[in-house]
């Protein structure tokens, strides 16, 4: 397993932010322009419905990262990330992320692998949901 924190480039520029439990780390209505590296704590990803309801769709813990899809695809996706415990997060600007990807094949592979894992997790979740009855989907959502 790739140890993200031990492979941070010495010249990597980032901002350290601390978030309290329940604070929003990534706001779906704002453009961040950063890769978020969760250094410590836990955070959850929520999909926001049109009525304001929140559906927990993913959880991060330990050392992980998020925000890469928006940076690399150039599309904003309306997901919110909220701290479920106190968290420390490094924010890496897009230009620094791209430089890091060019210079470190291990990091490039790690990021590709994490994106693939997220894609498979979401695909599995969608498949399981599609097999539920309407009643089961409703009960799962409350």
Place the predicted regions along the sequence by residue.
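Cyclic nucleotide-binding regulatory module and flanking cytosolic helices
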Residues: 1-23, 65-66, 70-71
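Cyclic-nucleotide recognition modules
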Residues: 11-12, 56-113, 120
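A short beta-strand-loop-beta hairpin characteristic of the jelly-roll/cupin
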Residues: 43-56
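Polybasic "coupling" helices that flank or enter modular domains
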Residues: 102, 106-142
């Amino acid at each position: 397993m790739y140890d993200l924190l031990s492979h941070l480039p010495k010249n990597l520029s980032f901002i350290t932010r601390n978030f309290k439990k329940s604070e929003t780390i990534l706001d779906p209505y704002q453009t961040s322009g950063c890769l978020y590296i969760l250094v410590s704590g836990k955070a959850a990803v929520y999909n926001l419905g049109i009525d304001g309801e929140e559906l927990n769709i993913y959880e991060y813990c330990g050392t992980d990262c998020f925000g890469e899809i928006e940076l690399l695809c150039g599309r904003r996706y309306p997901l919110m990330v909220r701290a479920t415990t106190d968290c420390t997060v490094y924010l890496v600007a897009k230009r620094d992320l791209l430089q890091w990807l060019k210079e470190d094949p291990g990091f490039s592979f790690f990021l590709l692998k994490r994106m693939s894992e997220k894609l498979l997790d979401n695909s599995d979740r969608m498949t399981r949901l599609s097999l539920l009855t309407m009643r089961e989907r409703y009960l799962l959502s409350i």
